[in-house]
Amino acid sequence: MAYWQREVLRSGTSMTFNQTYELDLPKSGWLASLVLYMRSTDTGAGFLTAVKWRLIDYISKIEVIGDGSEIIKSYDGRQALASFFYDTGREPVSMWRHYSNTPHRQWVPILFGRYCFDEQFGLDLSRFNQVTLKITNIATATEF
């Protein structure tokens, strides 16, 4: 049985509206999965007329890129949730409501193996000089 190190790479980091957030991942090690936890509070009337009312609907792209150009994983927010569901048969934890001034929360697991703590399959970070996580959102101050 392998020893799994659980590490929080960033906590309490804010994303700017309609921007891409980038995070450089460790240079070595074995990565079986990433779990992104996102939360926000909507504005008073932002979601009352919105077609997109879940937090995940405002994530237009989640990418894991190796050496600046090799795409390892690339999803929009809904595809990331669907991929986890197809792999595990479970829906990721979320909390969203369709009324004003409500906190929205979303867990987005990204698997590099067959499941979260897969000991056989995953991403060997030492194969790349640099691995970057990029999260692009399309939210505006009107909604959040």
Q: Where would I find each of the regions flagged by the language model?
A:
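Short, low-complexity Pro/Thr/Gly
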Residues: 1-144
